[in-house]
């Protein structure tokens, strides 16, 4: 059982840690954190894309691009977490490629819906049964996180 004084000290330290994190975010100092989140998001998103594109049998060779870019973004995010230089060079390059591929994927998914029987005239059905129109924007958001991390300052 902790004494009252020990409880106050523990609570004070955890509050200080949270306050410091909030202060870093308020002042735009969360480059390392956002780099790590970009790395995690890139891996999770790449795995999800792999499973979805695998169920479509990778019918278009372009389906492999976001699967390959996921680990590249993750490696750049981890490098950006440990190195300021990598956060300012490798991370924005990888993130820009991910954003471009996400926008391209949105166009390809829209084209896939248009090619279904009835096309956009039967949009409700084709959006449910065809390629998910907004799913590529998820990978675009992960790339955007990496671009944002590159312009922020490192935590104190």
Give short role names for the model-derived ranges.
Residues 1-156:
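Short amphipathic, positively biased membrane-proximal segments
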């Amino acid at each position: 059982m902790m004494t009252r004084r020990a409880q106050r000290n523990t609570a004070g330290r955890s509050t200080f840690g949270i306050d410091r994190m909030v202060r870093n975010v308020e002042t735009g100092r969360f480059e390392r954190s956002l780099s790590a989140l970009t790395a995690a998001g890139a891996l999770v998103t790449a795995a999800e894309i792999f499973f979805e594109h695998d169920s479509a049998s990778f019918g278009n060779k372009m389906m492999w691009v976001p699967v390959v870019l996921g680990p590249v973004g993750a490696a750049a995010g981890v490098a950006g977490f440990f190195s300021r230089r990598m956060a300012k060079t490798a991370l924005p390059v990888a993130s820009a490629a991910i954003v471009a591929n996400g926008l391209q994927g949105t166009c390809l998914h829209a084209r896939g819906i248009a090619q279904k029987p009835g096309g956009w005239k039967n949009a409700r059905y084709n959006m449910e049964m065809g390629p998910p129109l907004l799913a590529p924007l998820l990978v675009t958001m992960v790339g955007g996180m990496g671009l944002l991390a590159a312009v922020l300052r490192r935590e104190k």
